[in-house]
Curated annotation (Swiss-Prot):
Gene3D superfamilies: Phosphatidylinositol (PI) phosphodiesterase. Its cofactor is Mg(2+). This is Dermonecrotic toxin LhSicTox-alphaIV1ii. Its main location: secreted. InterPro entries: PLC-like_Pdiesterase_TIM-brl (IPR017946). Disulfide bonds join 45-51, 47-192. It catalyses: an N-(acyl)-sphingosylphosphocholine = an N-(acyl)-sphingosyl-1,3-cyclic phosphate + choline; an N-(acyl)-sphingosylphosphoethanolamine = an N-(acyl)-sphingosyl-1,3-cyclic phosphate + ethanolamine; a 1-acyl-sn-glycero-3-phosphocholine = a 1-acyl-sn-glycero-2,3-cyclic phosphate + choline; a 1-acyl-sn-glycero-3-phosphoethanolamine = a 1-acyl-sn-glycero-2,3-cyclic phosphate + ethanolamine. SUPFAM superfamilies: PLC-like phosphodiesterases. Its EC number is 4.6.1.-. One of its GO terms (biological process) is lipid catabolic process.
Amino acid sequence: WIMGHMVNEIYQIDEFVDLGANSIETDITFDDNAMAEYSFHGVPCDCRRYCHKWEYINTFLDGLRRATTPGDSKFRKELALVVFDLKTGDLSSSTANKGGKLFGQKLLQHYWKGGNNGGRAYIILSIPDLDHYAFISGFKEALKTAGHEELLAKVGYDFSGNDDLGSTRTALNKAGVKDRERVWQSDGITNCVSTLFRGLDRVKKAVSNRDSSNGYINKVYHWTVDKYGSVRDALDAGVDGVMTNDPDVIVNVLNESKYKGKLRLATYDDNPWETFKP
């Protein structure tokens, strides 16, 4: 999976997919009432990127729906997976549940069109703070209450704070997410700091958890990877996805002889919740 990083304006969806992304990551900020408000990152952000692109959340979700709805003039068949980087820093552990509920309602209305022929992409809810696990509980509750529990089959989960894997598993379980129930595990650091500085130790631990008989992880992705050498290192470590500002770099690496016969770009027909067995 090539995950286009920080796609916060609608026009960027085409820009990143044109460069080779089959997945995008979008930042979601919340107002004082725990309501998702903008697709917006703000400063600081990755080097060589403009931090202030934004849309109102409803506008962005409408654009995203069109990009992932077959038959729409804006449809991009390559775009199969969307990571919502939920900026829950302004939520407390007590308002996280409300934030999740409201976000679930918003996705149902603006992305899934009330469950009637909405966007088809798979969704990952990515939360930076383990203490905000109730966001997931609230989100699930909103879809169940609305009578659309079936849409949860399109939703996966990630905690992005580089926490201890055991603690991450506990937080997921507290949110009612079973082991390997559509779980992605991210690991990474801003591109302003070399990924060599962070190293791949935790990535490798996540990969071995994924591949063990008693792990909790379905897939592993590494962020934010823009340099050729770092992409190769991540692929050699066994990741399923790479989040990047430069999707074309990942495409070029995948076309190298070492990887060409081994790896290919995922399509919509590849289930992003199934652990890949080469």
